[in-house]
A protein has these predicted regions:
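Non-catalytic, surface beta->alpha helical segment in thiol-disulfide oxidoreductase systems
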Residues: 80, 90-130
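Active-site-proximal cofactor/substrate-binding loop regions of enzyme domains
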Residues: 10, 17-98
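Bacterial N-terminal signal peptides
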Residues: 2-11
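Short, well-ordered beta-strand segments enriched in hydrophobic/aromatic residues
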Residues: 142-144
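Short amphipathic beta-strand and strand-loop transition segments with alternating hydrophobic
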Residues: 134-139
Length: 144
């Protein structure tokens, strides 16, 4: 019986399965701005998809419409998603918008995304001493 257990443990250790994902210390929102016609987006899409498997990570994907003028109409894009990305550009004082772009916890941004780089940024944001999040409500015409 002990030999069977040791064999099973050895098989698990060498089976090539990925180690369980580390849980973030606090919930972290990860926003991906992407486009169907973007050559660099599949890698970022995959990295965010893998990050979403981490307990505590809330992944959101936004298809932007500003590449539609090139002739490839993105079926997931919405003007509101492009506006959200431009709002981050202003808030973070970035020079422009691009795809893919990942915004982590509304504070950190990555242009493009590789799994290791994204994982490190998520863990950094999860450890930040800014919990609970700062929330601001503004009245803008008919919306709050």
């Amino acid at each position: 019986m002990a030999a069977a257990a040791a064999c099973a443990i050895g098989m698990l250790a060498t089976s090539g399965e990925a180690a369980p994902r580390r849980t973030t210390e606090r919930p972290v929102v990860v926003e991906l701005f992407t486009a169907q016609g973007c050559a660099g987006c599949p890698e970022a899409n995959l990295a965010v998809e893998q990050a979403a498997e981490t307990p505590g990570v809330i992944a959101l994907t936004y298809g932007v419409d500003y590449w539609d003028y090139l002739g490839w109409r993105d079926t997931f894009a919405k003007p509101a998603f492009s506006a959200r990305q431009r709002a981050y550009r202003s808030a973070m004082r970035l020079r422009g918008v691009s795809t893919p772009q990942v915004v982590i916890a509304g504070r950190t941004q990555l242009t493009g995304a590789r799994e290791v780089e994204l994982g490190s940024a998520i863990q950094r944001e999860a450890r930040r001493e800014s919990w609970p999040p700062q929330i601001e409500f503004r009245e803008t015409g008919r919306q709050v």
